[in-house]
Amino acid sequence: SLQSGTYVDDNYANEKMKNLNEAYVGLFLDQQKKHSVEVGILPSYIGFETAVSHTNLTLTRSLLAENSPYFMTGIKYNYKPSDKWSFSGFVTNGWQRIQKPEKDIPPAFGTQISYKSSSNSVVNWSTFIGKEFNGMDYTMRYFSNLYWDKTWSNKWRTISGLDYGIQTLSNDDTAPWFSPVIITQYTINSKWQSAFRAEYYQDTKNT
């Protein structure tokens, strides 16, 4: 799919193919469709919000979402042993990046575990590890995103999440950051919905 606008200018500033939103292919590796592989510019496996506002509970995106990837470029392997469990592994070009920044930068790695106890409840845990630019040099970044998406009734839905990351610095110091958030949405009728978001973001070293 293609894209343009201020979102593209902000999030794809250093990319030559910035007008590509998603471009990937996938295939199942077995007849039972438990194993699959996808390759290309993929939707981000981190977080519960997308760049398309109407798919989120609130029209404005959370600080947590704005400071984590909206897309990833690389390879995804998924194993889905049942309707409840899903396990994925990723090899990517890095944190929200289509092109690799430098030839000597190794690929980044990630994982995703999803547990869907019912059609109304999903718990998801995603991780990322890779070298990212800290303002001076490329150093290691470790990141974890955990959230619970629960639909309580045909009117109430909540999402609670927690991000925690660590960026190593060139002077052997570390720069941690974290962000808890809770979002609730109430459906008034078929035409109207209301939502409330409470969040906290701490990044004392401006990672």
Give the label of every model feature segment:
Residues 3-22, 30-114, 124-131:
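Surface-exposed coil loops of outer-membrane beta-barrel proteins
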Residues 84-86, 104-105, 111-207:
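Detector for outer-membrane/organellar transmembrane beta-barrel domains
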